[in-house]
Amino acid sequence: MPPSRATTPDGVVLALHDLGGDGPPALLVHATGFHARVLGPLAHSLGTRFHCLALDLRGHGESGVPPNLNFDWAGFGSDVLTAVDAFGLVGAVGVGHSCGGACLLLAEEARPGTFSALYCFEPIVFASGALPAPDPSAPLARKARQRREVFSSRQEAYANYASKPPLDVLHPDVLAAYVEFGFEDLPDGSVRLRCRGQNEALMYEAGLRHTAFSRLDAVKCPVVIACGAESRSFGRADFGPVVKRLANARLEVLPRLGHFGPLEAPSAVADSVIRDLDPRPT
């Protein structure tokens, strides 16, 4: 199904996706560098309990880029609110991965009461009061700028990613969706990443400066902060201050998963979401 479109207050045209399912609405928000369709396998597993909707954040997938390439994460929060309004959601649940989890919190802070509950898997929210200046040499930003963007075909791209870290841990259906919908066709027959490396680097740099942590007390809905027991990015201790600052939150550690948990084991994460957020008896 082709995406619908909605325009943010600052003029970014977003791609919105109906990922299917039956039940109360759930808005799914992807991580930096990915796009809504990689959450398709998660949505499939959630589909017996939730009607899953999603968006491509600015600079990702089929969405446009912001004016002057300003990737301040407040804009991501605005993207979420634009999607909420375009879908006509009232009291939906939100499920976010990494950057997507932070975006849900930013959106709820900006407009309290937007969501009835949130499930945030390793959200990029830091308990530091310091806001470091963007550092172009930071590892994630540097790697994004160096990332190969063009392949001869989607088949070559898939084989490349499946053969080495970090994307070799992704569920095959997730990786297939990442490649199928994350590349655009070029006139010479080759394909190029839609989320350009320079833009992704700017997103990582801006991710060090958002202020979600300082405003967590505005979030009153129930929140589950989930993390992977095998994550090399974050651990239980990193999220303790976030859980403590939220009014109604708890931490859940999922065994055998890393930072890519929702993309590694969509069904396991879906089971966790259903246990935590679905009010209907199992």
Can you name each region flagged by the protein language model?
Residues 183-244:
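Conserved serine/cysteine hydrolase catalytic core
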Residues 29-31, 97, 227:
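The conserved beta1-alpha1 loop
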Residues 254-266:
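Catalytic histidine-centered segment of alpha/beta-hydrolase-like enzymes
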Residues 263-275:
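Post-His helix in hydrolase/transferase enzymes
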Residues 15-65:
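Conserved HGGG/HGGXW glycine-rich cap/lid loop of the alpha/beta-hydrolase fold
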Residues 148-206:
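Conserved alpha/beta-hydrolase catalytic His-Asp/Glu region
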Residues 41, 53, 57-95, 99, ...:
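Active-site loop/oxyanion-hole signature of alpha/beta-hydrolase fold enzymes
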Residues 90-133:
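Conserved hydrolase catalytic core segment
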